[in-house]
Amino acid sequence: MKPDIASTLASLKDFQRATVDYVFERLWLAEDQVKRFLVADEVGLGKTMVAKGVIARTVEHLWDTDKRIDIVYICSNSQIARQNLGRLNVVKGFEVRHADRLTLLPKVTQSLRDQRVNFVSFTPGTSFQVGSSGGAYAERVLLYWMLAACWGAAVTGAAY
């Protein structure tokens, strides 16, 4: 079901609505469009609400032309991401997916094909830090099966 943009936008304060309109204009309508936009403000001034408004306007804008709309949410930590994803979901009835680690996204991508609107989140602390760790167990299992599928045989771990 198409999101109720009017109720989403009506819940915003005037300065939040002005920000939503400006961001949407720059992302989708301006002659000199941008591909990304950072909204930075003091704690408690409604950045999440602004994001919800931008998402609502974007989903409405793409609804008639795109078969699938993917919303990717990058947040400072996993707990906040899980909390905010429910708030950002402007299309009720669509499941929110959270991939704790970027490398685990393939575990949820198959189900993304079945939905019109998808919400996926990542957290930099788990997705984007590179170190000497072997990664999470689930990552190693996923990589094993991906390599096995590519090579058409069981991966033994033996040196080649």
Specify the residue positions occupied by each region the protein language model found:
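Extended charged low-complexity segments that act as oligomerization/scaffolding linkers
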Residues: M1-Y160
